[in-house]
Curated annotation (Swiss-Prot):
This is Endoglucanase B. GO terms for cellular component: cell surface; extracellular region. Residues 1-33 form the signal peptide. GO terms for biological process: cellulose catabolic process. Pfam families: Cellulase, Dockerin_1. It comes from Clostridium cellulovorans (strain ATCC 35296 / DSM 3052 / OCM 3 / 743B). Keywords: Carbohydrate metabolism, Cellulose degradation, Glycosidase, Hydrolase, Polysaccharide degradation, Signal. Belongs to the glycosyl hydrolase 5 (cellulase A) family.
Length: 440
């Protein structure tokens, strides 16, 4: 999705966690198994990806990581996502605003470092990571008149990204673009014109060729490549061209389906109810169209974005999440939930299911249904950071328990919930961080 949220209060806790210093060069923190390219197909990779979660409205936020109301990303956040059963992190990134002038289009080193730092949080959890070009609509225009300029910039930008990550293994997946489309046109979301679709194919080819040309592991890296607007429409799928018929290209689609249930709140057609036999048949038909076009013909597919907004309709959302994940998985397709961090019910764009400020699932039933439908499993019984007494809530009682630990009257210490600043110790600093969390 590409609508920004209104600015929210930034968590005071977040700044405590982000202290990693980069020493230059490629900083591969993942295990050895993640630093090689295996002899497996893209379909096998997608099967291993299982089910995913988007770190939305964060590194894709224009102006900076916290500009759209989410806190700084921490290792603990990604730990929590992995523990819930998600095996893939999609990391949407807006590079525009962090790119220098032509002809070099140099990417700001601090921004590149931060991207790598967050990616490594997921690699440390043995997760797949997807890195893309996200809100680049200001320059990535799908028109013949813009072709030369756009291709030059794509080449420079992807060369820098690909070189930075070329030593990472096949748990890292590149995605050429997010939702390339004719922004502002009447047919922006309904397939665009032939010119638009043709230009998206050309830009995808430029990106894939650029990535492959950097060599190293990028020569065989699996790359996600979208249709126009990443839409699963007959026009966009029929005019889609796989760059070079590359066997390691994965089709990237976004399916907020059915739209008026999943993503619409204000139109006359909006609905908060889903789950009838007719509803299920219609959603299955959407997946059949994707399967018959691509998967049946040996082409791997990832649904890079899906989700439902919170309309105070928990029962329908749970039914939809489980059925959606099941229908995708049985067809060999990985679904990835779009989480923009916005959990408040009854407002537009409330796709959030995870509260990153207190590390709790704001819609646990929806999350569990999604995981269940995909056949994934939780890796462990996990508790939120700060839930010192492990009762499933973070509140003043946890503050009292942590204080008793520091006073020596309680020796039952679990670093995973008590070490608030992740420095390997439990002391007064952690008590201060917990206090800030409770007050935020």
């Amino acid at each position: 999705m590409n609508k920004r949220l209104s600015r929210g209060k930034i968590s005071l806790l977040a700044s405590v966690f982000v202290t990693t210093t980069f020493m230059g060069g490629v900083n591969v923190l993942a295990s050895t198994a993640k630093t090689g390219i295996r002899d497996i197909t893209s379909q096998q990779v997608v099967k291993e990806m299982k089910v995913g979660w988007n770190l939305g409205n964060t590194m894709d936020a224009t102006g900076g990581e916290t500009n759209w109301g989410n806190p700084l990303t921490t290792h603990a956040m990604i730990d929590k996502v992995k523990a819930a059963g998600f095996n893939t992190l999609r990391l949407p990134i807006t590079w525009d605003g962090h790119i220098g002038a032509a002809p070099d289009y140099a990417i700001d080193a601090t921004w590149m470092n931060r991207v790598e730092e967050i990616a490594n949080y997921a690699f440390d959890n043995n997760m797949y990571v997807i890195i893309n070009l996200h809100h680049e609509d200001g320059w990535l225009k799908p028109y013949y008149a813009n072709e030369a300029e756009v291709k030059a910039k794509i080449t420079k930008v992807w060369t820098q990204i690909a070189n930075r990550f070329k030593d990472y293994g096949d748990y890292l997946i590149f995605e050429t673009m997010n939702e390339p489309r004719p922004v502002g046109a009447a047919d922006e979301w309904s397939g665009g014109s032939y010119e638009n679709r043709d230009m998206v194919n050309r830009y995808n080819l430029t990106a894939v060729n650029t990535i492959r040309a950097t060599g190293g592991n990028n020569a065989l890296r699996h790359i996600m490549v979208p249709t126009l607007a990443a839409a699963a429409l007959s026009t966009t799928m029929n005019d889609y061209i796989v760059p070079n018929n590359d066997s390691r290209v994965i089709v990237s689609l976004h399916m907020y389906s059915p739209y008026f249930f999943s993503a619409d709140l204000t139109s006359q057609w909006t609905t908060a109810t889903w789950g009838s036999d007719a509803d299920k048949a219609a959603l299955s038909a959407d997946f059949d169209a994707v399967y018959n076009k691509f998967v049946k013909n040996g082409r791997a597919v990832v649904i890079g974005e899906m989700g439902t907004i919170n309309k105070n309709n928990l029962d329908s959302r749970v039914k939809h999440a489980e059925y959606y994940a099941k229908e995708a998985t049985v067809r060999g397709i990985t679904p990835i939930w779009w989480d923009n961090g916005y959990c408040v019910a009854g407002k537009e764009q409330t796709f959030g299911i995870f509260n990153r400020k207190n590390l709790t699932w704001c819609c646990p039933e929806v999350m569990q249904a999604f995981i269940r439908g995909a056949g994934a499993t939780q890796t462990q019984t996990s508790y939120s950071l700060g839930d010192v007494n492990k009762d499933g809530k973070v509140n003043a009682i946890d503050y009292a328990v942590l204080k008793s630990i520091l006073l020596g009257t309680n020796t039952n210490v679990d670093l995973s919930v008590s070490d608030m600043n992740k420095d390997g110790k439990v002391n007064a600093l952690d008590l201060a961080v917990l206090k800030k969390m409770l007050l935020s």
